[in-house]
Structures are given as C-alpha cells and as structure tokens.
Amino acid sequence: MYRDIKFSLWCDFLERDFINGEFLNLIENSVINGATSNPSIFKSAICSSCAYALLKDEYKRKRPKELYEILATTDIKMAANKLLKNYANDDDGFVSLEVDPNLYDDSEGTYKEGKRLFNIIKMPNVMIKVPATDSGYEAMSDLMKKGINVNATLVFSISQVKECLEAFSEGSRAYAKRFPGTPLPKGVISIFVSRFDRLLDKSLKNAGLETSKFGIYNATKAYKIIEQQDNKNIRALFASTGVKGDELPADYYIKELL
C-alpha cells in the first residue's frame, strides 16, 4: 500500500487471535507490512481477550512483569514469523516490542532489557522500542552496536530527531567496524503527530486560528530531516495519527502526511 510513493502502513495493534487471523490477511493482501506494540496495547489485549485466559491461569504464580513478558514476547514472535516473508524481500516486515517504560531514565537498564528481550524472541525482524530520552539515546546506540534493530519512540521535537539520528549513526558505525560487510541494524524514528494538536487546538480555536495543523507541520519537518540523511537503514515512522472526537475524518492525519 502506498509503495508507489515509498510509504507503507504498520499496524499499531497486536492480540493473539488477531495475529492468527486478520493480521495475516492484512499482510497477505499487502495492506500492512509492519507492526508496532506498546505495554498499553498488550495490557488491553491481555485483560480483555479470551485468548490469554488459560495462559494466565498457567502462569498465575509468576510476577506481573514476568507474566507480561511471557505473553508479549510470544505474541511478538508470532507476529514476526507472519512478517518474515516481507523482511526477507526487503519490504519492511518489522514488529516492535517496547522496553519497560519505568526504565526511561536508566540507560544501562534499558540496554540490558532490550538485549534480553531481543535474545528471548530470536527473530531478525524484531525492533526494540526505546523512548527518546537522554538515557534512551545511549541505550539506542548500545543496542545498535550489538546489531539490534531499534524503534525510537515518543519523539515530538526536532531536537529529539537529531539526537536519535546521532545515536543510530554512532551505533551503526561501531557495528560496521566490528563486523565489516555484515548488514547493518535498522532503525525507525517514531514521530508523534496528533498529540500536539490535542494540546494546542483549544487555544488556537479560541484565538480564531486554524487548528489541527501544527502536528502535521512538525512531523513533515522531522521527516525531511531524516530523509536528508539518505540512509536506507533509518526511516521515519509517523505515530499517533488517530483523531479524537468526530470533528476530523478518521484518516485526516494520514492523508495530510501523504
């Protein structure tokens, strides 16, 4: 989808029954060619879906984080397998798993957890999602030094984009030096779009100014900076493209960004 303009859609939702059903249909029909997840998505899926009921009973003696990791890494591996053909054909095919958000200010903890989760799943098309914080940048670089793909998340500002690019570049250079001729790890920078407008629109509307535009402007500027690097291993990923309420069409941000 949108391949003629070098855009692709990644599904921002995972749940076990969905992975075994509609998710595969979307891949096979070339609607999506990637996926992302986060702890909130998994919490909703695990708490509301019957697909996890027996597993939760089986692992009920596990601590909450242990139980979460068992269920989440299993789902991520299933999704990665479904996307493996895309990955093999150099058509994206990545799925992301986020580190514990409580580690946002702990670079070493983020790196160790990201490496551990990647090694549990053991799939080449998995990305470890790391928040774009001062500690996160260091962890991103360290993960890439080990050949681990990274999804930099919670990116709102141009300064964050530049920090992510530097972290990716540093990690990739170190990996290339250690393993010359080996394919480099991939990275995406997840630029959050609509949340700017949710914050600003009320004030802009009260001032008689046009609304729901700043997020698009900011994301477009960030995208251009990333594309100027001319690095096929690093791409922009537009996140938070959904709308709230019924004032805007559901696909408003997607169409504007295209």
Regions found by a protein language model. Name each.
Residues F13, A45, Y59-L71, V95, ...:
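Domain-level signal for soluble alpha/beta catalytic cores
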Residues N20-I27, E138-M140, V161-E166, D246-L248:
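Catalytic cores of alpha/beta
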Residues N149-L258:
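Catalytic alpha/beta core domains of metabolic enzymes, predominantly
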Residues I41-K43, S48-A139:
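Active-site beta->alpha loop and helix N-cap motifs at the rims of alpha/beta catalytic domains
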Residues Y2, I27-S30, N81-D90, K115-K122, ...:
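Acidic (Asp/Glu)-rich catalytic clusters
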Residues M1-E22:
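N- or domain-start disorder-to-order transition segments that initiate the globular core
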Residues F18-L54:
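An N-terminal structural lobe/cap that precedes and organizes the functional/catalytic core
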Residues D12, P124-T133, I148-Q160:
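Catalytic beta/alpha-barrel core
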